[in-house]
Structures are given as C-alpha cells and as structure tokens.
A protein has these predicted regions:
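Unchanged
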Residues: 87-110, 118-194, 230-326
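Acidic, metal-coordinating catalytic segment for phosphate/diphosphate chemistry
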Residues: 2-56, 175-201
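A conserved beta-turn-beta hairpin within the catalytic core of GNAT-like acetyltransferases
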Residues: 75-79, 223-226
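Eukaryote-biased recognition of intrinsically disordered, low-complexity regulatory segments
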Residues: 72, 202-223
Length: 326
C-alpha cells in the first residue's frame, strides 16, 4: 500500500527513508512524465569511478579550536587541512568520516549531524559533518604515515599554511552551527541508508493559497502519490538540474522561487548501488493561484500540523545548506 503524501513528508522530516518500492515507482513515473530531458539515461553512479563522494569533518572543542591535520601527500606535504577524504566503495558516509578522522588525526569521532552538502557538477559531492571526539590520541610527528604527518587543535586556521582555502567556509559553517547558540539551526540530520542505483533530486515545493492562506505542496496527480523527483545530470551542476526540472513542472516562465536547503539525504553506500537522493526544500513567494503546475502534478493542501513543520524549516539555517560549486 502506497503512503500518503502527508506520511511521506513526516518520514522525511523525521529522518526516515521512504519505502524503496515507492521511490522506484515515483522515479519512473516522473521520468515518464517529463521525459528525463537532459539526463543521460545510461549513466550509472559507481563510487570512485563515475561518481566522487567526499567526506569532511569540522570538529570544534570546548575552547572553540578546530581539529586540523597536516598533509603527508607529496603534492601538498606540510600543508594543513580538515580531516577529509574519499568515500570507499561499499562504505557508508558515517563509516567514511569516522575512518578519515581516525586515520588522519588519531581521534575517534562520533558524528552528530550533516552541516553542509557541496556539489560540483552532478557527480562530485562533499558531505561535511560535525560531531564529538569520544576517544583516541592526537597524532604526533612521531606517528606520521602516508595518511598525515600530525594533527592538532587550532584556534586560528588563518595562521596555518593551508592546502586549500576552500575549507574556510566549511569551518565558518561549523562554528556557526556548533558555537552560536543564539541562532536557530536545523535539527540534526544524518544520512539514511537505502539501496539506490541513481543520483536523484526530490523536491518539496511549497506555496500558500491566496484565498485560504493554507500551505500547499506539489505532488503527482495519480497514484502512487509522490513528491517530484528526477535524475541529477552528472555532467552539469545541480542548479542546472533544478532549473530544468522546475521548468518542466511549471513551464518556461516559472515564477521566482527559492531553494532553501536539504531536508533529507538518502545514500546507498554500495548496498544495491552507489546512488543517492537529496530532498531539497523550495518555496514560491507567489500564491498557488499564480503558479499553476503543468503536466501531471497538482498542488495539495497540507494539514495544519504538517504545514507548521514545513514552515518552520523555511528560515535561514533551518535546512542543511547546499553549496553548488560552479
């Protein structure tokens, strides 16, 4: 029996996977509806071959210091960087980030939440976590190996010779999430393990009805009911996939809309494929009456409790940021 849209959204917000049967059916339904334009249908994500998954950890101690490691690789030996590295085949994201932190710093990490997802083209993803150190011993120069030379807690990373300054924004994001308790932040979000063989983008698109002020979401108009979902084009950046998909859903003159961030992340980790599914929250300022859907999708009114839950995730920092690297 297929799940109601309300139940699907509740599961996503609570960090639970949707049934694989529902996802498989809805994926194919959408591909039929929009023709899968712009997406090579023969593409299969294979970890470290046709898709690259990176994990990184921004760990901040009680003194506000950031955990850093010194590179051992010949191309950047002596430079400093966050604990980070490639996800290995058949490895899930949590195991990957724990492994990288242990190998490069000597410390044991208990990941608590995703704080940022980055994407460069549709087949390179970096997942940034934060968490707590629960054990281990900080790596010293005497323990240097091919993974790293040493690790240390750093108060000001700008005092270091960095491998790349691309981590500065990651560290700033981590500090905002961990140390600035005055700013409301999204709840903890962890990857959900589910077999997937494609790179997928699911949209939770909202708008309010002018006549009732009730929140609506866009859903399929036939069973099994589902949120819009499409394949991510591996050769273009993710915003291109989003833009093209929104045009398919609302026509070429799609009204101004705002992508807020990630509500959920489903990741296969080699179990039934090397795919993923990002659920992105998108909102229209214009009312439902002014943004009619095309094709086989309709606006669906949400009950008050669920509308409140979705609305609470619309402000800044209330979803996991998605950074598309151009």
């Amino acid at each position: 029996m297929s799940l109601s849209i309300e139940k699907q959204i509740e599961l996503l917000l609570a960090g639970h996977p949707l049934e694989i049967g529902d996802m498989h059916d809805s994926t194919h339904a959408v591909q039929d509806e929009i023709g899968g334009k712009g997406t090579p249908s023969t593409y299969i994500p294979i970890c470290q071959k046709t898709v690259t998954y990176i994990v990184a950890a921004v760990v901040i101690n009680n003194q506000g210091e950031v955990l850093m490691m010194q590179e051992a690789k010949a191309t950047c030996s002596g430079k400093w960087y966050l604990p980070a590295g490639r996800v290995e085949p058949n490895e899930n994201l949590l195991d990957a980030v724990k492994r990288e932190v242990l190998e490069e710093t000597g410390l044991t990490l208990d990941p608590e939440t995703l704080i940022l997802v980055e994407c460069a083209t549709g087949s390179w993803f970096r997942f940034v976590f934060t968490g707590k150190i629960t054990g281990g011993k900080l790596k010293t120069l005497e323990e240097a190996n091919e993974e790293s030379l040493q690790a240390c807690w750093v108060n000001n990373v700008n005092d270091l010779s960095l491998r790349s300054h691309d981590i500065i924004s990651l560290i700033e994001r981590g500090k905002t999430y961990v140390t600035n308790k005055n700013i409301p932040q999204h709840p903890y979000l962890m990857p959900i393990s589910i077999p997937l063989s494609k790179l997928l983008l699911r949209l939770t698109i909202t708008s309010k009805k002018r006549s009732t002020n009730k929140l609506h979401v866009l859903v399929s108009d036939t069973m099994p009911f589902h949120l819009p979902i499409c394949e991510i084009n591996p050769h273009r950046n993710l915003l291109s996939t989003l833009h093209n998909f929104m045009k398919e859903l609302f026509g070429n003159g799609v009204a101004q809309h705002k992508p807020h961030g990630i509500l959920s992340l489903e990741f296969s980790g080699g179990q039934g494929g090397d795919g993923l599914c990002l659920t992105l929250l998108v909102s229209f300022k214009l009312p439902v009456e002014d943004v009619p859907a095309t094709g086989k999708f309709i606006w669906h009114e949400l009950p008050e409790n669920l509308a409140t839950s979705i609305t609470s995730r619309l402000p800044r920092n209330m979803t996991v940021p998605l950074n598309v690297i151009r």
